[in-house]
Amino acid sequence: MLLRLSPSRMALKRKLDSFLRNVHSQSAPPAAMAHARTVRLSAREEQLRALLLDVCRSIDAAGDVTQPIILRWAGGWVRDKLLGIESHDIDVAINAMTGVHFAQRMCDFCTLPDAIKRHGIGPRDVGNLHNVARNPDKSKHLETAMVKIFGLDLDFVNLRRETYADDSRNPAMEFGSAEEDALRRDATINALFFNLHTGCVEDFTGGLPDMAARMIRTPLDPLQTFTDDPLRVLRLVRFASRLQFYIDPATQRVMDHPTVLQALRVKISRERVGVELEKMLKGTCPPQVEVHFWAQPTRRALELLDELHLYHAIFTDPAREPTERPDLRRWHVAYECLGWLLGNRSPGSIGTLLAQSEEAVYVAWNLAAVSPWMPVEEPPGVKKKANALPPVAVIAREGFRAPNKLTDVMAASHRHRKEILQLKEAVCHGEPWTRQRDRCGMAIRRWDSQGGFWTLQVLSTLLVDAMEQVDSWPIVAHPGKPSQPADVPETPLSSGASKSKNLDPSIAKRDDFITGWQKFLDHVVELNVYNAPTMKRLLDGRALAQALGVKPGKWTGKALDVCMAWQLRNPDETDPSKAIEEVRMRRDELGIPLDG
């Protein structure tokens, strides 16, 4: 079952789906891709292939195995090679020996003088061998050997087949054939092999024609595939958004099946959910993949989670029965708004002012993801503990194991949302007190000190405000400048509405909404309080106490705030004596034990 979309969103989705089906048709002709049976190896890859084949011959000659060793490079490396994407990570699949055993024999072989000479092995070409123990909670179902050779990161593992229990995503593993190994994988495009002995690509599941069609499909029945391992649902979303592929409709129809959603909620560790979500929200397309503004990989990933009804299986506390679920009907406004804002990186734009660094952009996408939870309060009658996290931060911590730094920003965004919104509205209405530099600057310092990233707290408030004020977020309106994404307005925006008079009503509403927030941020910049949290104090607590002739105490923090407010009112002053005098005059209010 898919979401019922508004007519405007349905039209946009048809455009986007059509675009994703046809993107890259020039760089990778479907006919050529469907019949591609070889790949072009780099010099380092050719060197590695020759070495590995020599190791196979030495093992076969020793008679340690019952059948000849056959090596295949598997999965993502093959997919990326066929797409023209460079990859330095190679999974090596072995037919008749464990990965650990083969890797040890290979490392021993690389110490032989003849091998060193024949393959040009330098003193730093072979790294240390690391055996990674079986760890099902982290999707390591077999012991794996890892080593770096010729600058390439190799993982060695045997071909296998899997058997799943109903109540676990951790399979029983046995040696298997190449076809059985391919069938157990999450998608046909990840089930391709490059046979080192024949030099050909082996396709047991139809992965080559699926790549030609830019399609993601499961090798086996999708319901069984996802029930066995519900993490595959999230992996397919990630691959579709990163590679700009679309998900096969038959596969897509099963992704929100109640059995799959329940398995995703309770059968899979939340750490693994967090890993996949982090990869989605940090998602970038490879340089070879052309990305249209509509199809930003992170925005597209959230859109797929939305359309496939996966939200409540991810952003949830699986240990508790849900007592309240946020309204998702306008969630699309939040992530579409953020994608639109980040598409305009011109100086002074909202996206530039509120998310300056790569880390800030990642946090911003997390905030967009949890926007439906941001205004949710604890149910009435629930006894709150001191410093208890709000529901949005609890969901992030328990649902996808968000780190403390991230939950702190979410909690602060929740607590300061109304205050931020009130200040923004006051600025837009021209309230005289908003011209007071100390009031605005101290508010910003307080937000930043209680969770950090005050700019991202403002961005979170903006996204929630967008969900509440705007019915839809038009992605395409009118052409922008060549240097800007289509439909991104110039910044700063005029506060007047004349620009929007002849536009579609939804576009006019969007532009008016952005105008208000741009006006607020322009005001912050004009007051020169954007960097208020990093302003250096003219004196610290010890110096203030010494000037007052008392010991530091509980009063110190409030008194230092008085000094900082004075600094904000007097930005050109470098002598703190008048600030100290103001503290002295307010000693009773501040609780300072002075004699006179």
UniProtKB/Swiss-Prot annotation:
GO terms for cellular component: mitochondrion. Keywords: Mitochondrion, RNA-binding, Transferase, Transit peptide. Induction: Expression is positively regulated by the leucinostatins biosynthesis cluster-specific transcription regulator lcsF. The keyword Mitochondrion applies. Its main location: mitochondrion. SUPFAM superfamilies: Nucleotidyltransferase, Poly A polymerase C-terminal region-like. One of its GO terms (molecular function) is CC tRNA cytidylyltransferase activity. GO terms for biological process: tRNA 3'-terminal CCA addition. PANTHER family: CCA TRNA NUCLEOTIDYLTRANSFERASE, MITOCHONDRIAL (PTHR13734:SF5), TRNA-NUCLEOTIDYLTRANSFERASE (PTHR13734). Nucleotidyltransferase; part of the gene cluster that mediates the biosynthesis of the lipopeptide antibiotics leucinostatins that show extensive biological activities, including antimalarial, antiviral, antibacterial, antifungal, and antitumor activities, as well as phytotoxic. The function of lcsQ within the leucinostatins biosynthesis has not been identified yet. This is Nucleotidyltransferase lcsQ. It comes from Purpureocillium lilacinum (Paecilomyces lilacinus). The lineage of its organism: Eukaryota, Fungi, Dikarya, Ascomycota, Pezizomycotina. The gene is lcsQ.
